[in-house]
């Protein structure tokens, strides 16, 4: 696909005079364009759901979720991956974000990194990619060689693959087994795909990881019951989670959390089933960590 023919490289008539308007009008133009992004994502919800089901199946079988991207796309993958351990209590290596150019590229532009097909393959080899893993290639343009080569290599290994881009019929979409293509149109600043395209990608990644965690029993109701208390805010959140899930008071919630080494799931089962920590943990283990199953089946 030629660069000049890509939707993400097109000219947006709504912002053609943006350098001549007031600051407030400038903000309104950007905001009006941003409003279209969730609607673009809504149109691809069936594709997102299909990807979540595949990711969950692979992760349940011992695989990992691997994000692969360059520039903004790579940074978004790293952002999503880095939030999973504290939010859902998963091991750091379960969701991995890879960016063209390596760690230095998180804060700096690395010339030519996104054009390196070898880089995409090598980065996957360096994390010992296996057929159990799912590789999600992220590229607003859908033409990034680093991502395309990574997806090709992943498919050769037998991995399930997902391609996220904002141009229909892109190489990323056709290379991956599953394509998620929210069409957000031309950017306010021509070609600045960190804007609407980046926002769309962030929304999609939010759904992929959150959907995976919900289906993995990391959420009870709408509570993040595997959250790790790494700071005072999260310490308080744990107490509130146990309170909200059980109807107990703060003192009871804190006592249960202390008794089970601050594991929200165990504390919730302790309170709801009137069990000690060891028995509550045992029942959770018997049901794969799903609170709902412990409550419904016993």
Curated annotation (Swiss-Prot):
Domain of life: Bacteria
The keyword Lyase belongs to this UniProt entry's keyword annotation: yes
MF terms (GO), sorted A to Z: carbohydrate derivative binding; carbon-oxygen lyase activity; ether hydrolase activity
Keywords assigned by UniProt, alphabetized: Carbohydrate metabolism, Lyase
CDD domains cross-referenced by the UniProt entry: SIS_Etherase
Catalytic activity: N-acetyl-D-muramate 6-phosphate + H2O = N-acetyl-D-glucosamine 6-phosphate + (R)-lactate
Active-site residues annotated for this sequence: 83, 114
E.C. number: 4.2.1.126
Transmembrane segments: none
One BP annotation, GO: N-acetylmuramic acid catabolic process
Domain SIS: 55-218
Claim: Lyase is one of the keywords in the record: yes
Task performed by this protein: Specifically catalyzes the cleavage of the D-lactyl ether substituent of MurNAc 6-phosphate, producing GlcNAc 6-phosphate and D-lactate. Together with AnmK, is also required for the utilization of anhydro-N-acetylmuramic acid (anhMurNAc) either imported from the medium or derived from its own cell wall murein, and thus plays a role in cell wall recycling.
The protein's assembly and partners: Homodimer.
Protein family: Belongs to the GCKR-like family. MurNAc-6-P etherase subfamily.
Name of the molecule in the record: N-acetylmuramic acid 6-phosphate etherase
Naturally occurring in which organism (per UniProt): Escherichia coli O139:H28 (strain E24377A / ETEC)
